[in-house]
A protein has these predicted regions:
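Hydrophobic anchor residue at the start of the ABC signature
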Residues: 148
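Conserved ABC ATPase signature
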Residues: 134-138, 142
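Conserved ABC transporter NBD signature motif
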Residues: 56-71
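Conserved structural motif at the start of ABC-family nucleotide-binding domains
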Residues: 5, 19-22, 131
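The feature captures the beta-strand-to-loop junction immediately N-terminal to the Walker
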Residues: 36-38
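Conserved ABC ATPase "signature" region
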Residues: 112-130
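Helix-to-loop junction immediately C-terminal to a conserved catalytic motif
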Residues: 51
């Protein structure tokens, strides 16, 4: 079975405290893996380091045998609520469309099929009726479903 994520000797700190120390693991294609632990154990920091949203002190991270930057389009991610600016003036459909920018291209207009893909993802999450609703006007659970739709529309190889 192919390795989709390989982490070796990963260490990172947060607020001058080392929270990850020599972390090693592999995730294989076709498997489901969970990251569990008590509050403050470093779960969120681990994900941020893997996605290059937080610097690592040492170690290597490979997605599909390459760097995250090169494999980014193959990875779907749902951010934690605290890392989203809920007052940013955008609607649910636009948030989901953001998941397609890797396919659309930088500074290009989305085509009709992109909107159809985004609407289908919203529909899968039971949120199609809220496509034009501002993200800030949704409940917390509805907001999370919109971000799940954004991850799903990417058609990623790793979520």
């Amino acid at each position: 079975m192919d390795i989709v994520l390989q982490v070796s000797g990963l260490s990172a700190s947060y607020l001058k405290n080392r929270v990850l120390d020599d972390v090693n693991f592999n995730i294989h294609a076709g498997t489901m893996t969970g990251i569990v632990g008590p509050n403050g154990a470093g779960k969120s920091t681990l994900l941020k380091v893997l996605l290059e949203l937080h610097p690592r002190l040492s170690g290597t991270v490979e997605f599909f045998g390459t760097t995250y930057r090169k494999a980014k389009s193959r990875v779907g991610y749902v951010p934690q609520r605290g890392s989203v600016d809920w007052d940013f003036p955008t609607n649910s459909l636009d948030v989901v469309m953001m998941g397609l920018y890797g396919q659309i291209g930088w500074l290009k207009w989305p085509r009709r099929r992109h909107k159809e893909l985004a609407m289908a993802a919203l529909d899968k999450m039971g949120m199609a009726d809220y496509a034009e609703r501002q993200i800030s006007q949704l409940s917390g659970g509805q907001q999370q479903r919109v971000f799940l739709a954004r991850a799903l529309v990417q058609d990623a190889d790793l979520y």
